[in-house]
Each structure stands twice: as C-alpha cells, then as structure tokens.
Amino acid sequence: MLILTRRVGETLMIGDEVTVTVLGVKGNQVRIGVNAPKEVSVHREEIYMRIQAEKVPGQPNF
C-alpha cells in the first residue's frame, strides 16, 4: 500500500485521468473529492461491497 501525506487543498493523481483532492479534515473525518471520467466507477468501500454481493453470477458488468 502506498501511503501519502496531503494537506487540505492538495491533490494526488491516479493515472492520467483521476484526481483525488483533500477538501477538509474535521476530527477523524477527511472529506475528499474525486474527479474521474464517467466510465470509472467511484464508490465508498461499503457500497462497493454491497454492489458486489448483489451481483448475479453470469450477469455482464456494465
């Protein structure tokens, strides 16, 4: 796992098209903004896990 330190307002790049910006920090919560192309899905982990659990085997991924 790559570990990075960023301050509020600073951005990191994932590939050429995805940016993640630290918007704010309050207590133990960090607000981030993700800018990605429409074809790139962005989910919180708990939502992603629910989506994966609900997939029907053999169903195409769109």
Swiss-Prot record:
Keyword tags: Activator, Cytoplasm, Repressor, RNA-binding, Translation regulation
Cellular localisation: Cytoplasm
One Pfam family named in its UniProt record: CsrA
A GO molecular-function annotation: mRNA 5'-UTR binding
Any one of the GO BP annotations: positive regulation of translational initiation
Coiled coil residues, start to end: none
Transmembrane parts of this sequence: none
PANTHER family noted in UniProt: CARBON STORAGE REGULATOR
UniProt function note: A key translational regulator that binds mRNA to regulate translation initiation and/or mRNA stability. Mediates global changes in gene expression, shifting from rapid growth to stress survival by linking envelope stress, the stringent response and the catabolite repression systems. Usually binds in the 5'-UTR; binding at or near the Shine-Dalgarno sequence prevents ribosome-binding, repressing translation, binding elsewhere in the 5'-UTR can activate translation and/or stabilize the mRNA. Its function is antagonized by small RNA(s).
Family: Belongs to the CsrA/RsmA family.
HAMAP family xrefs: CsrA
Subunit organization: Homodimer; the beta-strands of each monomer intercalate to form a hydrophobic core, while the alpha-helices form wings that extend away from the core.
NCBIfam families: csrA, PRK01712.1
UniProt-recorded name of the protein: Translational regulator CsrA
